[in-house]
């Protein structure tokens, strides 16, 4: 007998409730069944308080599960149940409660008793515990355990990827970089040159291209709507777009972006013109020096022109290459110098007027074609530069 404290005896003296152990009587079974029909399964510790049954909660639970359940099945296991027990044991091992859940009406204690009895019998006879098909499956599961399948990485939209070169430029002031004129400073200060020469940009651009080729799902294909203004620098390298549909805010941002773009392009044009002027000045000085040297030479057209011209002036003339993008002022100045040279040649007393043929230009200048044609190829348009190669 077990004394369960907290209660009071019939004679009024303090004491505990005496819990009963051992076999259950028919009256106790009927009391427990009536409690389950009224309150349902569970909360077995309240059975004693509500029915004054002198049994603990664990004893009530086991009595109901193993003996009093309506769907409880008694007797030996059927061949189908035995086959299922063997299959489940080969997969789960000694998980008796999980095996009992697969066998309605059977308790985990019954399944455990059946397996232990079978195990001892097969060990005495030297027989395998599992049939060949179950043994092979069990061996394969031990050799190659099932790994939890890792979920596929979520496919993030391409627009959520952030690349430094795909971000819109910040609305910085006009002179946000060094504009001091020098070949090195201008090349470094130019955003376009910086992007082209930066190895970080080349690496990012190549990585992005390879990433798009291997992953077509992430290929970035954006279609610009009517209120989206693309921003592009020279060489088509730095390309960004503003994707927003927020009315006035979007309009203000696009206006500021367009203004910043125009200012940046103006700065680039100014630096390009300054750089071009720096390279034109030495060429212009070489031409003027050559013309002055030729004017000082009295025998310019006599005895063969190629032998009279000094080596320095000839090299300077041969090193010149006409460019189509020179300014109109440069062309006018050179035309005036050539006209002076031709005027001087027409007034020279050493021009031969013998058997050689002469050429009359639009300015009524008479020249010897043998002495003049090999230096300057004559063109109908006198405003064009002579083809010096």
UniProtKB/Swiss-Prot annotation:
Accumulates in pollen grains and pollen tube. Mostly expressed in mature pollen grains, and, to a lower extent, in inflorescences and siliques. It is found in: Nucleus. Pfam families: Myb_DNA-binding. Disruption phenotype: The triple mutant myb97 myb101 myb120 is impaired in pollen tube growth arrest and subsequent sperm cell release in the female gametophyte thus leading to a drastically reduced fertility. Altered pollen tube-specific gene expression. One of its GO terms (molecular function) is DNA-binding transcription factor activity. Residues 16-68, 69-123 form the HTH myb-type domain. Residues 140-159 have a biased composition (Low complexity). Its main location: nucleus. GO terms for biological process: pollen sperm cell differentiation; positive regulation of DNA-templated transcription; regulation of DNA-templated transcription; regulation of gene expression; regulation of pollen tube growth. Residues 44-68, 96-119 bind DNA. Keywords: Activator, DNA-binding, Nucleus, Repeat, Transcription, Transcription regulation. GO terms for cellular component: nucleus; pollen tube. Residues 131-159 are annotated as: Disordered. Transcription activator. Binds to 5'-CAACTGTC-3' and/or 5'-TAACAAA-3' motif in target gene promoter to promote their expression. Together with MYB101 and MYB120, functions as a male factor that controls pollen tube-synergid interaction in fertilization. Required for pollen tube growth arrest and sperm cell release in the female gametophyte, probably via the regulation of pollen tube-specific gene expression. This is Transcription factor MYB97. It comes from Arabidopsis thaliana (Mouse-ear cress). The gene is MYB97.
């Amino acid at each position: 007998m077990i004394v369960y404290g907290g209660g009071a005896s019939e004679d009024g003296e303090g004491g505990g409730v005496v819990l009963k152990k051992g076999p259950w009587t028919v009256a106790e079974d009927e009391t427990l069944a009536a409690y389950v029909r009224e309150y349902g399964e569970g909360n077995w510790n309240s059975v004693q308080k509500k029915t004054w049954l002198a049994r603990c909660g664990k004893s009530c639970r086991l009595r109901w599960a193993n003996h009093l359940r309506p769907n409880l099945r008694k007797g030996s296991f059927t061949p189908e149940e035995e086959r299922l027990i063997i299959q489940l044991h080969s997969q789960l091992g000694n998980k008796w409660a999980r095996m009992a859940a697969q066998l309605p009406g059977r308790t985990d204690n019954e399944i455990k008793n059946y397996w232990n009895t079978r195990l001892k019998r097969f060990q005495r006879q030297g027989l395998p515990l599992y049939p060949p098909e179950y043994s092979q499956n069990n061996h394969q599961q031990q050799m190659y355990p099932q790994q939890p399948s890792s979920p596929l990485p979520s496919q993030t939209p391409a627009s959520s990827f952030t690349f430094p070169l795909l971000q819109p430029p910040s609305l910085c002031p006009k002179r946000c970089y060094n504009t001091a004129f020098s070949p090195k400073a201008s090349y470094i200060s130019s955003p376009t040159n910086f992007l082209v020469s930066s190895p970080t940009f080349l690496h990012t651009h190549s990585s992005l291209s390879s990433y798009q080729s291997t992953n077509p799902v992430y290929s970035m294909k954006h279609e610009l709507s009517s209120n989206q203004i693309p921003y592009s620098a020279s060489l088509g390298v730095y390309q960004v777009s503003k994707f927003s549909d927020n009315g006035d805010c979007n309009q203000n941002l696009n206006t500021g972006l367009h203004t910043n773009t125009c200012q940046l392009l103006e700065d680039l044009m100014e630096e390009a013109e300054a750089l071009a002027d720096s390279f034109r000045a030495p060429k212009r000085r070489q031409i003027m020096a050559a013309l002055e040297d030729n004017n000082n030479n009295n025998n310019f057209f006599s005895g063969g022109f190629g032998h009279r011209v000094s080596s320095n002036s000839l090299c300077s003339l041969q090193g010149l290459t006409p460019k189509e993008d020179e300014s109109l002022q440069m062309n006018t100045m050179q035309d005036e110098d050539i006209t002076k040279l031709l005027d001087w040649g027409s007034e020279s007393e050493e021009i031969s007027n013998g058997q050689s043929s002469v050429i009359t230009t639009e300015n009524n200048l008479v020249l010897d074609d043998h002495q003049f044609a090999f230096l300057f190829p004559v063109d109908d348009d006198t405003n064009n530069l002579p083809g010096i190669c």
